[in-house]
Amino acid sequence: MVKDSSKHTRRTSVPQGSPKVGSEPNKIAAKTPFDFSGKNLTPYGGLLPVATMLEKLGFKQLVEETLTVHRIPRAMSIYQFLLAIVLAIYVGFSRLNHLRFVAQDPMLTGVLQVGELPPQSTFWRFAASLALPVAKQLLVLQRVLRQRVWEAARVRLETITLDTDTTVHTLYGQQMGGRRSYNPKNKGKRSYQPILNFLAETHEYVGGELRNGDRPRGRQIARHLDNVFAALPACVGQIFARADAGFYCWEAIEA
């Protein structure tokens, strides 16, 4: 006995309603009006003044002229990736995974002019694609931005005090460069010892270096200080240095 298969086949349902149309991203710029007492306030409304400041400082043009990235991402431009990371740091996020909390926030997406942020894996691939020369280019970008901020704020410090110190970053696992060295909170564990420099007068971060867990030597300290001095604005003429006993060596004094 032959059965007609068409009688026992379930018909496919026809989609109802109009097809979904993708909405255009919001466009928020320096000329966008804002209010601090209106309704429907976003918790990240403070990003608008930050984005306005970066726009007036020429951050986009500076990124396009300074950074050389051979792998061009598709989700967003290089400037949009860097701006998203910078704004996330202003919000208080310390990990790229935290960007998922603001992936569809109208303020952040409006500043970036995108519909929504790409997933975390896209940000990680973008960061992994950056070559080592990009790190020096970012320092150049930071130096130019500091110079422009000082000129806009009319800050003219001819004499400054530079604070230099190391910190301990405990490692969990077998990361490259980890050493068992000075680690008072987690004795015996591997760690890194980054060097950080701050400007005492303005509390600005001037420069830093991610190092292994060994104690820095005299030549390393001198080379690091030379790079920090080069990042200072041109108006600085006299520099006073403050550091603990671990940095006291003849190479550092000569630098």
Annotated model-derived regions:
Residues 224-228, 242, 252:
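Short, hydrophobic/aromatic alpha-helical segments in well-folded domains
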Residues 233, 245, 249-252:
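Internal, well-ordered domain-core segments that constitute the primary functional module
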